[in-house]
């Protein structure tokens, strides 16, 4: 098997990024992402517009990925694609295209769970990229998900904690919207937080049993705080923006780290990885570095290009499924809610 070249063409279309990548034996040859700017004016992703943009982008993105990898279609060993979770209209574009390409080239089709792929991005073959060993804990943090996952093998994953309402990415974005920041607001909160005082304002941490999370009450607390303060001073947010952002970020990261500490204590697993769009946040990255020093954890943080939606992570998941000959048939359908 080691001498065989396994070229995986991967397709990702779960939300508003159209992405394609080519991996050879787990190493990235190309990783192309077409980001849809159309949603910014609406303050969030519009599913119908996302689906239409995927239809326009998918062919050129795949052509780019193959060209950059210097791979011909006939050299592709299998097609891996995101089956879910995500927006149904977006998923259907990638699923239909992957099935058609697989059928036309007469090569295997591999269906991938988007959230598993975020975790498996830690196993992309790169010389300077240390990988976790099994078992480890993975915290998936994004606009749609907040989970703590116990990972005992590539596809043996158990969700041991998750949000009971809103995801952490939504807490960042909605807080930003309340502050009058443009979409996507999460990265802007991170940017302003770096120059603010994280203890300037105090926000409540929701009390949730076990390893589960809740962020809906936190968003409400931010809203009421801003409404109350701007009533007294209409320019309050403008004057205190950096401190407010720092305090919001400090509280959210505190919620995440508290639950991770509890998960480490309950499982005895001290290897901890983060995955998903919010893992690009500088505060959570620093908090994990601090955790290594304070509590002796071994922490794994993905490269920035693998935090947001990308096809490289779909490709590495596809590669490990290919090794197991775990292929899908052509009756496979997209699933907007797809638990693992």
Swiss-Prot record:
GO terms, biological process: tRNA threonylcarbamoyladenosine modification
Cross-referenced SUPFAM superfamilies: Actin-like ATPase domain
First-tier enzyme category under EC: transferase
Cofactor note: Binds 1 Fe(2+) ion per subunit.
Organism domain of life: Bacteria
Catalytic activity field: L-threonylcarbamoyladenylate + adenosine(37) in tRNA = N(6)-L-threonylcarbamoyladenosine(37) in tRNA + AMP + H(+)
Location(s), subcellular: Cytoplasm
Keyword Nucleotide-binding among record annotations: no
MF terms in GO: iron ion binding; N(6)-L-threonylcarbamoyladenine synthase activity
A family per Pfam: TsaD
Cofactor: Fe(2+)
EC number(s) stated in the UniProt entry for this protein: 2.3.1.234
One GO term describing the cellular component: cytoplasm
Binding site for substrate: 140-144, 173, 186, 190, 281
Listed InterPro entries: ATPase_NBD, Gcp-like_dom, KAE1/TsaD, Peptidase_M22_CS, TsaD
Residues binding Fe cation: 114, 118, 309
Role: Required for the formation of a threonylcarbamoyl group on adenosine at position 37 (t(6)A37) in tRNAs that read codons beginning with adenine. Is involved in the transfer of the threonylcarbamoyl moiety of threonylcarbamoyl-AMP (TC-AMP) to the N6 group of A37, together with TsaE and TsaB. TsaD likely plays a direct catalytic role in this reaction.
Stated family: Belongs to the KAE1 / TsaD family.
NCBIfam families in the cross-refs: gcp_kae1, T6A_TsaD_YgjD
Full protein name: tRNA N6-adenosine threonylcarbamoyltransferase
């Amino acid at each position: 098997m080691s001498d065989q070249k396994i070229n995986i063409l991967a397709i990702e279309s779960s939300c508003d990024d159209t992405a394609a990548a080519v991996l050879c034996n787990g190493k990235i040859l190309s990783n192309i992402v077409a980001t849809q700017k159309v949603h910014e004016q609406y303050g969030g992703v519009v599913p119908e517009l996302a689906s239409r943009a995927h239809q326009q982008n998918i062919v050129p993105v795949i052509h780019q990925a193959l060209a950059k990898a210097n791979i011909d279609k006939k050299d592709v060993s299998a097609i891996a694609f995101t089956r879910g979770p995500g927006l149904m209209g977006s998923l259907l574009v990638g699923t239909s295209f992957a099935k058609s390409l697989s059928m036309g080239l007469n090569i295997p089709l591999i269906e991938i769970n988007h959230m598993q792929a975020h975790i498996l991005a830690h196993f992309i073959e790169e010389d300077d990229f240390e990988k976790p060993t099994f078992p480890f804990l993975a915290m998936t943090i994004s606009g749609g998900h907040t989970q703590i996952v116990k990972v005992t093998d590539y596809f043996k994953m158990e969700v041991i904690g998750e949000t009971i309402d809103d995801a952490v990415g939504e807490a960042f974005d909605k807080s930003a919207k309340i502050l009058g920041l443009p979409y996507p607001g999460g990265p802007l909160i991170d940017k302003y937080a770096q120059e603010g005082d994280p203890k300037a304002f105090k926000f409540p941490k929701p009390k949730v049993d076990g390893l589960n999370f809740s962020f809906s009450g936190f968003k409400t607390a931010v809203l009421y705080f801003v409404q109350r303060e701007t009533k007294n001073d209409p320019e309050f947010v403008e004057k205190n923006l950096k401190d407010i952002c720092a305090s919001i970020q400090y509280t959210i990261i505190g919620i995440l780290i508290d639950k991770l500490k509890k998960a480490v204590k309950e499982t005895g697993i001290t290897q901890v990885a983060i995955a998903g769009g919010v893992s690009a946040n500088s505060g959570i990255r620093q908090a994990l570095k601090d955790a290594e020093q304070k509590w002796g954890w071994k922490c794994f943080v993905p490269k920035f290009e693998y935090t947001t939606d990308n096809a490289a992570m779909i490709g590495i998941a596809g590669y490990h499924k290919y090794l197991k000959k775990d292929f899908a048939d052509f009756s496979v359908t997209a699933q907007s809610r797809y638990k693992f």
